Design a protein with these regions (language model features):
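AlphaC helix of the eukaryotic protein kinase fold
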Residues: 35-53
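Activation-segment/catalytic-loop signature of the eukaryotic protein kinase fold
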Residues: 65
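Conserved short submotifs of the Hanks-type protein kinase catalytic core
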Residues: 71-87
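Activation segment signature within eukaryotic-like protein kinase domains
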Residues: 105-106
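Protein kinase catalytic-loop region centered on the HRD/HxD motif
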Residues: 111-121
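Conserved end of the kinase activation segment
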Residues: 167-177
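Structural helix C-cap motif within protein kinase domains
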Residues: 192-196
Length: 308
């Protein structure tokens, strides 16, 4: 192990060195808990094969999985190809994310989820610690297959239930709707630096928070993000909601298209103003030259008359 890339309790990501292959890798370690089923590892091996078949540029490629029995407990590990970047939760905590960056990150996550769905997969544990982002805002998603390998039950690493959907909390059922809901939470956090329903380690309490809803009127930082907030509302809505990842991608694209149109119109306006100002300046300079020429002619005429 070279260093810790990300450190969430009982859910650690390390930068490590594969001594056999002599290459740098990422190592994800999960501590065993009561939510993890007996055949989890065998199922995870099968899921890792499917993940490799997906071959999406937005999903971090899983090389191997295994288990380590130690005195302090059972630790499952997943070996990934090395990619530079930091987890999205570190970016959210430390930086202001502009609208274009948020939309770019969200679009890439959606494309990864869409590719997985085409292979009959969902994520089921989507949260900022499982999203790797580089300095150009390129995204790689980790932990695909973990929830599915656990028979659709989220493993709740470190008792983290903040990003679970209502039906995951209520009946331990996971599907693509869980990923829509988790993405809504992540996007909300990207804008407001906090989760919409608060935090709790108690599942019943978390459900009560969700049932209470969100008072968007009390939030600061909405200006300029209205269109994105409408998408977030639909992602978190339990009735009028998205059914396809492509729908969300199109809605996000329309925001960027509108921004591009506004920017283009401003550029055209600036260009027109520049041309007008340049033309006005040229006209004024020409008039000045004509006036100076006329004065010179008058002076020369007067001097000629005096000499004669």
């Amino acid at each position: 192990i070279i260093n810790i890339e990300d450190n969430i309790e009982f859910n650690k990501l390390y930068k490590a060195r594969d001594l056999y292959e002599n290459k740098t890798i990422l190592l994800k370690v999960i501590n065993h808990n009561n939510h993890i089923c007996e055949d989890f590892l065998a199922n995870l091996i099968d899921e890792s094969t499917i993940i490799r078949e997906i071959n999406s540029p937005y999903i971090l490629n899983m090389i191997d999985v295994g288990v380590d029995y130690r005195e302090d407990g059972i630790w499952y590990y997943m070996i990934y190809e090395y990619e530079k970047g930091i987890s999205l939760n570190n970016i959210i905590e430390g930086n202001y994310l502009h609208l274009e960056a948020i939309i770019s990150i969200a679009t890439q996550i959606l494309k990864g989820l869409e590719a997985a769905k085409e292979h009959g997969m969902y994520h089921g544990d989507l949260n900022p610690s499982n999203i790797l982002v580089d300095k150009w805002y390129n995204v790689k998603i980790l932990n695909f297959g973990v929830t599915k390998a656990n028979h659709g039950v989220n493993i709740r690493s470190g008792n983290n239930i903040k990003y679970l959907s209502p039906h995951q909390l209520c009946i331990n059922y996971t599907d693509t709707e869980s990923d829509f809901f988790a993405l809504g939470l992540i996007l909300f956090e990207c804008i407001f630096k906090k989760l919409p329903f608060g935090e709790s380690y108690d599942e019943e309490q978390m459900l009560k928070f969700i049932d209470k809803g969100i008072n968007f009127n009390a939030l600061k930082g909405i200006n300029g993000n209205e269109e994105l907030i409408e998408i977030i509302k639909k992602l978190l809505n339990r009735t009028e909601k998205y059914s396809e990842f492509r729908e969300v991608i199109l809605d996000l694209s329309s925001i960027m298209y509108e921004k591009a149109e506004i920017k283009e119109s401003l550029l055209i306006e600036d260009e027109q103003n520049y041309k007008y100002e340049t033309k006005t300046k040229v006209t004024k300079n020409r008039n000045k030259l004509l006036l100076i020429s006329a004065i010179i002619i008058i002076i020369l005429s007067a001097l000629t008359t005096l000499i004669i």
